[in-house]
Every structure is written in C-alpha cells, then in structure tokens.
Regions:
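Cofactor-binding active-site loop characterized by glycine-rich and histidine/acidic residues
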Residues: 2-135, 148-158
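Conserved thiamine diphosphate
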Residues: 7-10, 99-102, 151-209
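Hydrophobic/aromatic ligand-binding patch that stacks against planar heteroaromatic rings
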Residues: 37, 125, 182, 209-210
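Short gly/pro/ser/thr-enriched loop/turn and capping motifs at secondary-structure boundaries
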Residues: 55, 140-145, 226-228
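Short, conserved beta-strand edge motifs with alternating hydrophobic and charged residues
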Residues: 137, 192-194, 218-222
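Glycine-rich, Lys/Arg-enriched anion-binding loops that position phosphate/diphosphate groups
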Residues: 198, 202, 211-212, 218-237, ...
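Residue-level detector of conserved catalytic or cofactor/ligand-binding positions
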Residues: 255-263
Length: 264
C-alpha cells in the first residue's frame, strides 16, 4: 500500500531526541531514530544498548537522549540483558502484575564490535532461545569509539589503527564476517539488512517488520563513520547509495514461514 513516509513520521514522536553527542555525518543517529519511529505511538519500548559510540554519545548520566526505558550494558551482553528483561516482562504479565493490553517491545542496539565479536555468543543464545526482541547492529566496520581498531566486520584491505595499510601489509588481511547470513542460519522469524539513510522507507519498513514479528528478529544496518572512513560529513547519503549500488551492502530480508507442528 502506498503511503507518504514524511506524513507518517510527522505523526510519530521522535524517541531519540536532539542534543545527543554523535558526530556530524554519523549513520547511527538516523538508524536509532527511524527504528524507534517504527513503533506504534501507544507502545512502550525497553532499549538495551551495548557500550560503544551510540551509548557514550546519547547517555551521559544524568542526561539522556532516549525517551523510552534505557539500559546501558557491557559490550558483550546487550542481547542477554534484553532477553532477561523480556523474560521478566512475560513473567510479570503472566502473574497479572502488568496490564494485558500494554505492549512493551524490547530493542537492542550494538555496534559491530559488540555484535560481530565481543557479544556474538550472547546474541546467538538470545536468538536461539526465541526471545521476543529485536537486535539492531549499526555496522560501521570497526571499533570506532575506541580509536578505529579493526573488527571482524572490517572489510579486507581496510586501513585501521590495528591493520594499518602500508609497505608491510596492505591493510586488514582477512575478509569480513557475514553476520547477516549467520543470523539467517539461526532460523529466526525475521532477518533484514538495510542502510542508515538514502532509502528511509527500506529502513522504516524493515524495522516495523522486525518489531512486530513475533519472536527474535535481527537487523544489520550499514552505519558509515566519517572519522573512521575519512569522508566529509555531508557525504553520508552518497556513501550509503554507493554501498548499495555497488552491491557491497545488498538490501534484503528473510522471513521464516511458520510451519505447524506435526500431529499424530
């Protein structure tokens, strides 16, 4: 069905407010803002955020840019934190301590360092257990917050502070990990790969599907970094456009078709 995204956005509150400290030209703020705008206005959210660029720039106690409940958690356990909160919510609802008609969604944000590497075990566990939550990876291809060190999301031959391109090596020598396909292999209900800007409808629609699909969902979102990638801050949209058009970052999604249990 055709719709006007600007009109939809105008009628929904921004759940990541202005005043955060993210860099100009960074892909992470529009990712968080658009993902959360996919929520229905009446629904509440619990945000779990791994340590990283987004966390240190949006939540500096006692200040916060988040309007929903927010949990800052360690690099390695953002998915585990969200899965625990989701399990507690279900238990409280079952006990009648929370209203049945109040929907709470559990959304986790983590960078590629906290998702591809340090937090992969807890992410895999949360997805396999079937928690009703969405994990959003904002993938900028390195540990940008701590000084642009390589991660397993860093492309081959990329220049980072721990894989410097020069006369000894031409940059990172290993190929990047395909985390989206790893999540597909978990056979979870929904997996999507999208971009920060340039195609807002794609990000919005995939976010909406992920949030309102029952069970675990995963979104891998390309999030260019002007400091780490070395582009002028006004080129964010062009960088995203090139990533898609060159098929470096193809846009796709997979929805698991529900198959009924066999009967005897």
């Amino acid at each position: 069905m055709a719709y006007n995204l600007k009109e939809v956005m105008a009628n929904k509150p921004s759940r990541l407010t202005a005043g955060h400290r993210m860099c100009a030209g960074c892909g992470a703020p529009p990712i968080a803002r658009m993902v959360l705008r996919a929520l229905k206005p009446e629904d509440k959210a619990v945000i779990s955020n791994a340590t990283g660029c987004m966390e240190v720039s949006t939540f500096l106690y006692p200040y916060t840019a988040w309007t929903d409940s927010y949990i800052h958690t360690a690099f390695e356990c953002a998915a585990a934190t969200a899965s625990g909160a989701e399990a507690a919510y279900k238990s409280l609802k079952k006990q009648g301590k929370l209203p049945e008609n109040q929907e709470v969604k559990f959304i986790t944000f983590g960078g590629d360092g906290g998702t591809y590497d340090i937090g992969l075990q807890s992410l895999s566990g949360a997805m396999e257990r079937g928690h009703d939550m969405v994990y959003v990876c904002y993938d900028n291809g390195a540990y940008m917050n701590t000084g642009i060190q390589r991660s397993s999301a860093t492309p081959r031959f990329a220049d980072t502070t721990t894989s410097p391109a020069g006369s000894v090596i031409p940059g990172k020598m290993q190929s990047r990990k395909d985390l989206t396909e790893i999540m597909v292999s978990h056979h979870i209900p929904y997996v999507g790969q999208t971009i920060a800007v340039n195609n807002f409808k794609d990000l919005y629609e995939k976010s909406e599907k992920a949030i309102y699909t029952k069970g675990p969902a995963f979104l891998n979102v390309l999030s260019p970094c002007p400091r780490g990638w070395g582009y002028p801050t006004d080129m964010l949209m062009q960088i995203n456009k090139l990533a898609v058009e060159t098929c470096y970052w193809p846009l796709y999604e997979l929805s698991l078709i529900h198959i009924s249990e066999p009967t005897r």
